[in-house]
Amino acid sequence: MNIFKWGKREKVKTPEIDFGKGKFLSTKTYGNDRGFSCCFRQWKATHSHCSLLHGYSLGFKLVFECDSLDERNWVMDFGGLKELKNWLEHNFDHTIVAAKDDPKLGELKALEKKGLAVVRVFDNVGSEKFAEEVFKQMTIIIERSKYQKKALNPTVRVK
């Protein structure tokens, strides 16, 4: 490699770098522009107002990692994530998310029967639990893609 050093051209030995190996990262966000409008309550937090229904504008950031890029030099084919996008919209866009053990679950579902709400039931609620559920869903999508030999990079994983 030729470089200039104080006005003179010099040959400098550069280390060999294998760009085909190592860890590569790529990120994808959902809801980052306006968020998914959903509400939930932490019914076990009886000591605070978090036990009341309250709304959020949820956004999700996924980080993908792989050891080698695919044949297109991608970590992740984001076109293969429509299933996750649909799942996020189904569960978090203009919904009430309730814990399956919420003692008021019947009353929340009654709102849905009256056409006043869309209620989704999760094992648990909260930002951390939602992140865990998204991680699980994305892992399922990736593993299914590997099994079906679809477009997703076979070495990719959610970080």
What are these regions (language model features)?
Residues 2-159:
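Charge-rich, low-complexity N-terminal segments
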